[in-house]
Structure formats: structure tokens, C-alpha cells
């Protein structure tokens, strides 16, 4: 019932409209009320079709080439996901869909951005997608490669006090990855299974 509290939804709308970000997974803001299932469907650019929903044109173009899906080589795993999600509004972009229904949608709302996932089970790839979604929703995509590795099975940890960087292979297989520091490609690394490689941060 919090989602039909006008103060709650107005506060969130104001936050996003002024440049904030919103990320929803599954059934965020769900509460059937006044013809909407998602009470912030205008912010997210999606709603869920219910048995009594009005007929809506759901045949949309899917554009998988987006900042959030860069470095992603295989299909996104949405798990069981939430069914019957359709995009709506004037400022959305569908990044993944299943038939006529949407699975991953980004939306512009005022000066802000939202990202909607029908589902997001844990996996290294989904962790990377979520990371990219956070930077996108925050309106800071250019900041992501401040310290960054391209391979989803690798990660980077920074120790600024010692100017050292640890690049870690989280998998049981050899992995190749590109290391970016302050937006510049610094080195291409080949890491043994579970290897942690120390790199000097000379930037």
C-alpha cells in the first residue's frame, strides 16, 4: 500500500526528474491502482499487462546495442522473470524482449534515467550488467572505466593508499581481460585460473 501513498511516489518522481536514477527488478512499485499495476510505470517506462488491462500496442523494436550491454557476449539470463511486461511512454528503449513482451528496458524521465529488469538472478555476467546499469541510471557512464576490466569473469580492486591495483580472475579457466585506468586502456592481461595479479597505478 506504500505505492499508493502520493507522498512516496511524488518524492521518487521528483528525485528521478531532477537527475536521479531508478532501477527495478521483477515487480517494483507493484500495486493495482487507478489502471496501473506499477505505480511508477511512467518513471520506468514499463507496466505489467493484467487480465483486465486495456489493449496496448506491444510490438516494439528491440535495440541490444546500448551502454548497459557492452562487453556482454551471451544472451542475458532473466531467470524465471516477470511475465507480460510491456514498454510504454515516449522515452523508453527496449534492450531485450521475449516475443512481444519486454525483459530489459531503459527510460528517460525528466533529467533522470531508469532501468527495468524482468528478472536478474546471480551470475558474473548479471553482476556486470547491474554495475553498468547503476552507472547508466546515475547518469555517470563515463566514470565507469575509471578502474575497469572488460571480462565479466574478472574484477578489479583498487588500493589508492599504496597506488596498487589487484586484477582478479574469479573463474576456473584462463581469462583474458583489458584493464582501463581513468578511461584509458592500460594493459591486456592473461590470467590463470583464480589468479590475482598486482598492477601499479601509475596514472
List each language-model region with its residue ranges.
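A conserved amphipathic helix/loop scaffold
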Residues: 3-203
